[in-house]
Structure formats: C-alpha cells, structure tokens
Amino acid sequence: MRVIITGGGTGGHVYPALAIARGLKEARPGVELLYIGTARGLEADVVPRAGLTLATITVQGLVRRQVWKNIPALVKTGRGLGEAWQQVRRFRPDVVVGTGGYVSGPVCLAAALQGVPVILHEQNAFPGVTNRLLAILARCVCLTFPEAASRFPRRAKLVTTGLPVRPEIIQADRDSCRQHFGLRPEQLFLVTVGGSQGARSINGAMLPILKELAGCQDVSLLQVTGRRDYEAYLQQVRTQGIDLAKYGNITIEPYVYNLEQALAAADLVIGRAGASFLAEVLARGLPSVLVPYPHAAANHQEYNARAVARQGAAVVVLDRELKGGRLYQVVFELLRSREKLKAMAAAAASLGRPGALEAIIQVILKTVESG
C-alpha cells in the first residue's frame, strides 16, 4: 500500500498528519509513505525527524484582507499544482490523505484529477478554507467536531472520528504522574499552558492568580509561559513580591517536554483552544478554562472552545476579557467547587475520542480496499 500524506504550515495540521502516518505504519507495517509539504512550514523540520520521506512543493497562503497581494500567491499555487501533479504521478499512491493547510490544496487536487482517492481530516469546529473547497472531491471528510458538518457542501461525505492524539497522552498513569510532580492525594493541580502564539496575555492575567495561590496548601500550580516570555515573566513575578522558592507550590517553566505527564496529573487546565491541545485535554477527561487565540484564522479557536463549553466541559474566557479579571474569577470559582470540576471532567471524558486514530485508519483502509 502506498500513501501520500499532506498538510502543513502549523502544528495543527502537521501533528495530526504525523499521528496518521504512525497509525498506518502500525496497521500496515509494509506501507510506503510520502509526506508532501513545503520547505518553509513546520513540516520541513518535524517530518524528517519522524523518519518520513518529505517532498516539497511551492505554495503560498492567501492574504484574506488584502486581495491585491494574492497575485504572487496564485502564481506560486499554479506552480505548486504542477509540482504536486508530478509527485503524485511519480509515487502512484493508492490514497492521498490531507490534513489541511495551503499545501494540501494542490496535492489533493492533483490526486483527484488523476483518479486517486482523497481523504481529508478537519481539525476545527469552523473548517479551514482548503478543506471546504476540496470536500466535494474527497471520498470522505473525517471531522473532529460534528458542528463542522453544517459548513461543508451537502454533497460531501462526512464522518465524525475525532482528532488523533499521541498514545503517550492516553497511556500516562495519573497516580505515577502526580507522584512525579510531588502532589498529595487531596491537592488540586492547576496547569496553565499559554501556547506558542499569544501566551503573553494569559501570562499577564495569571499574575493575580499566582499571588493568591502562593503558599496555598490545597492547590499546586504549573505555569508554562513559552520560551519568548519566560525571563520577563519571572521578573514580573518577583516585582509582585512572589517568592517561588519560599512557597514551593508554584512552578513556572518556559516549556515542558512531558506535557502528557502534566495533563495526566492535572485537575484543571487553562489554555488556548487549538484543536490538537483540545483533543488531548478531552482524551484525558479534563475540565478546562479556554482562552481562544483571537487572531486564529476565521476565529476558529473560539468555535472550538464554544463547542466544548456547550457540552459543559469548559468555560470560555475571551482574550479581551483577561484584563478585566474574568480569568481570576472563573478559576477561583472552579477551584472552590470540586463538584463542578467533577461534572466538567465527566463531560470532557464523554467528548474525548481516544479511538480517533483507529477510526481514521479504518476509513483509509476501507477506501483503499474499495478502490
């Protein structure tokens, strides 16, 4: 079996693609995989590191608010379509899997025009423009959120599978992870992950929360600031008179490589509403306070957050509300109500789809078998 996987630009498109690639290798050890991306996106770094062959094509994203700037992008996309055509023709795949991003457009279009079955995966509640345009050419569109269905053409074949998460997220043992962080059984563990984009506003809103929690025996806090803001944030913490060494229940890190351990140990999570992060939070059955990144394309993070909040698994705090103290209010209301946290955790667990990867792999295998 020969499979082309394409998707790029950001982690939201690349990491689900890598999870699918790993799932295909496990399901069909002899599978031949080719990843098609760009030389400038995240995929240029992480795909070779994952042991996959990467081919690149020329493509450039469109500028939505300044149409006149799109002429060079359209020229590059035309060139990219020709390059994608050659890659598909040369590799002769049984199926092409696209996870979104501008690079997947030319690749999936070239495949469809050559009669190769195309399967798409959409990560967000508000689907990306590339997947919406490609949907009528695809054999199947795998959705993370059922709410996304209404934004696709009626002719599109849709199935809700969820978003594949790393096996480590699901397999991490809660008890051993809590021991790793030195937590007592009755102690609540609050984890704040600002994300690579726009962590600064969340960091600033966390300062009064840190001040209130400093020395609290009932709550431990891990805050991940992002590398860019780490030193400046530590200085802000010191300016507020918070002595981290003295109190011991607050840990501030620029980045964590063991996020699966932090999520397994957590009782409440604060973070952005990117699809991959949300899928991991829900797979762990975690209550969350979601602060959508306000500059995400088509405001898709707010759509993601609202979809989870409607089911009772999260509380949404908009970025513009952070300066008004709403994050402080929401966090302490939740920390004071273990029953509320328990109810939100149950709702999150009901939304989590730990079998998402297997469901997507089955869609791919059935498509190949049917020809």
UniProtKB/Swiss-Prot annotation:
Gene Ontology molecular function, alphabetical: UDP-N-acetyl-D-glucosamine:N-acetylmuramoyl-L-alanyl-D-glutamyl-meso-2,6-diaminopimelyl-D-alanyl-D-alanine-diphosphoundecaprenol 4-beta-N-acetylglucosaminlytransferase activity; undecaprenyldiphospho-muramoylpentapeptide beta-N-acetylglucosaminyltransferase activity
GO cellular component: plasma membrane
GO BP terms in the entry: carbohydrate metabolic process; cell division; cell wall organization; lipid glycosylation; peptidoglycan biosynthetic process; regulation of cell shape
Principal location class: membrane
Gene3D superfamilies: Glycogen Phosphorylase B
EC number from the UniProt entry: 2.4.1.227
Sites where the protein binds UDP-N-acetyl-alpha-D-glucosamine: T10, G11, G12, N124, R166, S196, Q301
Membrane topology: Peripheral membrane protein
Annotated pathway: Cell wall biogenesis; peptidoglycan biosynthesis
Annotated SUPFAM superfamilies: UDP-Glycosyltransferase/glycogen phosphorylase
Location(s) in or outside the cell: Cell membrane
Domain of life (superkingdom): Bacteria
Keywords noted in UniProt: Cell cycle, Cell division, Cell membrane, Cell shape, Cell wall biogenesis/degradation, Glycosyltransferase, Membrane, Peptidoglycan synthesis, Transferase
Reaction(s) the record says it catalyses: di-trans,octa-cis-undecaprenyl diphospho-N-acetyl-alpha-D-muramoyl-L-alanyl-D-glutamyl-meso-2,6-diaminopimeloyl-D-alanyl-D-alanine + UDP-N-acetyl-alpha-D-glucosamine = di-trans,octa-cis-undecaprenyl diphospho-[N-acetyl-alpha-D-glucosaminyl-(1->4)]-N-acetyl-alpha-D-muramoyl-L-alanyl-D-glutamyl-meso-2,6-diaminopimeloyl-D-alanyl-D-alanine + UDP + H(+)
Transmembrane residue ranges: none
PANTHER family noted in UniProt: GLYCOSYLTRANSFERASE, UDP-N-ACETYLGLUCOSAMINE--N-ACETYLMURAMYL-(PENTAPEPTIDE) PYROPHOSPHORYL-UNDECAPRENOL N-ACETYLGLUCOSAMINE TRANSFERASE 1
Family membership noted in the UniProt record: Belongs to the glycosyltransferase 28 family. MurG subfamily.
Function, as annotated: Cell wall formation. Catalyzes the transfer of a GlcNAc subunit on undecaprenyl-pyrophosphoryl-MurNAc-pentapeptide (lipid intermediate I) to form undecaprenyl-pyrophosphoryl-MurNAc-(pentapeptide)GlcNAc (lipid intermediate II).
Record-given protein name: UDP-N-acetylglucosamine--N-acetylmuramyl-(pentapeptide) pyrophosphoryl-undecaprenol N-acetylglucosamine transferase
Organism: Moorella thermoacetica (strain ATCC 39073 / JCM 9320)
Gene giving rise to this polypeptide: murG
